[in-house]
Amino acid sequence: MLYQQIAKNKRKTVLVMAGFVFLAGLIGAAIGYAFMGSAQTGIIIAVVVGIVYMFVILGQSTDVVMSMNNAQEITEQQAPELWHIVEDMAMVGKVPMPRVFIIDDPSPNAFATGPDPEHAAVAATTGILQRLNREELEGVMAHEVSHIRNYDIRLQTYALALASVISFLANMGMNAMWWGGGRRDDRDNGNAGQVIMLLLSVLAIILGPLAASMAQMALSRNREYLADASAVELTRNPQGLINALRKISMSEPMQNADPSSASMYIANPFKDGSWTHLFDTHPPIEKRIDRLEHM
């Protein structure tokens, strides 16, 4: 059951990322067709903008993310239990020992960041160190090390870059429509097929960012499920993570979390969510616990 869940989550990730790439290409083609006379030109622009965004976002260092969340790097002597748990999980997961940070916040939570295992770091709040026992803390750190092991931060960066490209292209298309752009020859000659294509292009430009946001959140939720399953693979003890998630779900919102980093945490640090869950960064904790109980 455990390995089936891991394989299923990986397949879903491939599908979501493929959908992202298709959507970015579709919006680029729509922009090109509607306002430049060539769908291929729009696709080329989408590719170039996507590469630029990716390099910019990947260039954001671990230290910047930690600073945004008011996290302080620690040594083994400052928090020996946390340090040794992270060290053990990294060893079992066969990844380099990540840097360890602590956030001074009473709400229990944790996150991992870094573009690859060689430049990764984990952060835990003071609240999680105070409220969780060793078994529960092992479950949480196994979850975070799994994000590092699965290259989730890099994957989320790619998704963010693609979502940013889609938003950028959609804004460009909306501005072109606002200022009266478009293929005047198609509008004037009244060709029904060309008019329909133009309308579909405009519809794609308008709905593209919404679809991209939904896909980005779906990817984030899927990677949380995968990290949960991978954590159990490391600890062989789903109950530790189950108990930790229950405690985290009953806690107050964080005070020192950066909103742009919310998707990185093991649970939403602000506790709010959309009623449909389509725009949530994390799956409902009850569903995560249910999956863990059936492993």
Curated annotation (Swiss-Prot):
Zn(2+) binds at residues 143, 147, 224. The keyword Electron transport does not apply. GO terms for cellular component: plasma membrane. Its cofactor is Zn(2+). The chain crosses the membrane at residues 15-35, 39-59, 159-179, 195-215. It is found in: Cell membrane. GO terms for molecular function: metalloendopeptidase activity; zinc ion binding. It is a multi-pass membrane protein. Binds 1 zinc ion per subunit. Its main location: membrane. Keywords: Cell membrane, Hydrolase, Membrane, Metal-binding, Metalloprotease, Protease, Transmembrane, Transmembrane helix, Zinc. One of its GO terms (biological process) is proteolysis. The active site is at 144. The keyword Signal does not apply. HAMAP family: Pept_M48_protease_HtpX. This is Protease HtpX homolog.
